[in-house]
């Protein structure tokens, strides 16, 4: 089980929820049972489409997806699900909640309540507020990843040495995603990013992951919408060039 799943499962158990840990090879019989409760899907973005297909017999209202990035196309077939945006970071024994994690959908209130009871701050949002939060989180994810890999430095070093580029990556990602979701980007998001990122100054990125769901998705959405995302495009080109 990955870090996100491990932390969520632990919080649920501390709140008194019975948790069945599901892996690629184990736990699926109970997951697909009509008697099962909520199913929280914690796989990486690149694995999501295959898991959604495997869950096709499960009622969408019992599904909770906590992936980052532009995953809406992968979830089109399961309308009525619950989405979560995780705002904590976990690596081994290290855990830090940066902000309350956010949920929207039929299980949002329950998820927020039990996770908060289990020690992970969480809130339920309506659809419009969640869309705005999704755009803001895309800005965060596009900075904390690809640019660090391109420059080979930590997040603190990146924000110090390349502040204008970091701001451009964030603003492009947030603005494009906000337009795609029909919400307005908030100029205050950048200041909030700097506050949330401060405890993560040590973070580095090796080979960037899931770019098609993050910076790559921003560039693709920008093209579709007639917008520009030149800094994200340049960083993607740098990775492609090796």
Model-predicted segments: where are they?
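Rossmann-like NAD(P)(H) cofactor-binding subdomain of soluble oxidoreductases
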Residues: 1, 5-13, 24-97
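Hydrophobic anchor at the start of a short beta-strand
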Residues: 16-20, 61-63, 122-123
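Rossmann-fold dinucleotide-binding core
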Residues: 64-137
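Generic structural signal for well-ordered, non-membrane alpha-helical segments
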Residues: 5, 104, 108, 135, ...
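Helix-loop-beta segment of a Rossmann-like dinucleotide-binding subdomain
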Residues: 89-100, 151-160, 198-205
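NAD(P)-dependent Rossmann-like dehydrogenase/reductase catalytic/cofactor-binding core
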Residues: 170-242
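Active-site-proximal catalytic alpha-helix in oxidoreductases
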Residues: 130-174
